[in-house]
Design a protein with these regions (language model features):
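Helix-rich effector regions associated with P-loop NTPase G domains
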Residues: 1-166
Length: 166
């Protein structure tokens, strides 16, 4: 992700400029929203750390089990769900509250920080094929939402017209 403008020299007289992009006002691909939050592109107040960490783990467990095993010394990563993995990470990193309860918020912060700082390694959260699939389902959900909204507006308009005037 590009945070600052960069000038990359490709040849003596040929440069590539990498500049930060602009986020669209409404994210219709839910997974992209989680990925943007995990990467730090979305402000902290716009998401819940625990939810983002669970979504991140849900993706990383099947795709990068070796990275999780190496970083958190967890055996048989693939047998974990995102929730049990977060709990195991909390126990490994000492994110325990009084009474031995797991501090999920602290564990989530650890997972997100480790991802952003590349402590888990260089990981990719989406491929072009995955994004195309997510986009198709996001566009369909958005179209369905628009149809429901339109039907609701028509219903309200009809109800207002049918209401007797005094």
């Amino acid at each position: 992700m590009t945070k600052l403008e960069q000038r990359i020299t490709l040849a003596d007289d040929f440069y590539l400029y990498d500049t930060p992009g602009v986020l669209w006002p409404r994210i219709i691909v839910e997974k992209s929203g989680y990925n943007l939050a995990a990467s730090g592109a979305i402000g902290v107040n716009a998401f819940d750390d625990e939810e983002v960490a669970l979504e991140l783990l849900h993706y990383l467990i099947p795709k990068y089990p070796q990275a999780l095993a190496l970083r958190y010394k967890i055996k048989d990563v693939s047998s974990h769900t995102d929730e049990t993995m977060l709990e195991a990470i909390a126990r490994f990193r000492g994110a325990i509250q009084s009474g031995g309860r797991v501090n999920n918020t602290k564990a989530a912060e650890i997972v997100i920080h480790d991802f952003r700082s590349a402590a888990l390694g260089r990981l990719t959260l989406e491929t072009p094929a995955e994004f195309a699939e997510w986009l198709a389902s996001g566009l369909q959900a958005d179209a369905d939402r628009a149809l429901r909204k339109e039907a609701l507006q028509k219903e309200k308009k009809t109800a207002r017209k049918a209401k007797p005037k005094n």
